[in-house]
């Protein structure tokens, strides 16, 4: 029963002792004698309702409540995936600052190195990357669009990071600044044709289409396709939507595009060589590709993300490997810049928006979906804040025929 273990739990329970030891190691001074300020005091409530402070003096930043035996077993295993699932299922509750709680992730382990070996490596090889993408993308992006629209920016509904001048700047202004940057950096003008890879809920299609640009947005998500078709009809945009995988896209009877924009889709295109070859086929010589992505170790996704957020072989951009593949092509790297803080702010603002809609989300879609996404967004914010993940944007230029000079690097940061 759910109370059998609870009755046996006391303040001397091994979990309390182990948590205190791990917290002490996490907050111990480093080689320079500086304490880890990320480790915060928190309160642990056991199933018998006894409360135990973990950490030093001061007000607890958050409270972990163990609700059931399953929650006790998950936390006692110090298994990150098990703890995440216990939280989503209601076997663990957390009150207070979730971002502060996630700064204690180093006390947990992710002991599932081979759990997703099949979906990451073997399944795309056996069944084909394109076919598996169609299933994997649906698992995330075909959640009811109204759910996403509750917490994305209200102006463009962008699901990629923004560019912020101040930490307290609105999500809407940060997103619009990034879109303007990509638009201008690619030299896009009214009447030109632009390919938008993974159009989402019509963010770039709307931004550029309202300026007279003929945008072709590619998607393999049903919800995305429906949203963009409705947007085009409602606003009278000179744009089109193509339901096709980018790697299979072969337009017939049309010239190459004047620009290609890839907002946060590189993570879903892990075959860099094939992707760059497709860029080269679809882009006019002398024109540019804008892309941005979160970056880090290739296939270095936590088990929670691989199982519950982005299934399959979605992978952070591996900058070293990507640039090595670019070097094999005619493309020139014009701009590359670090966006880690911008991505942190984007995830933080999304998470805050979602938390503000907590009651509505739970009423319409259930507690599990709410907790899955709030945990995902705050854990992503934590990864960017701590440097577990980074992010970059890049501009590539395809030289015109007979070009005698390289474009040159305008920015590296």
Report the location of each language-model feature:
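Conserved class I S-adenosyl-L-methionine
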Residues: 191-198
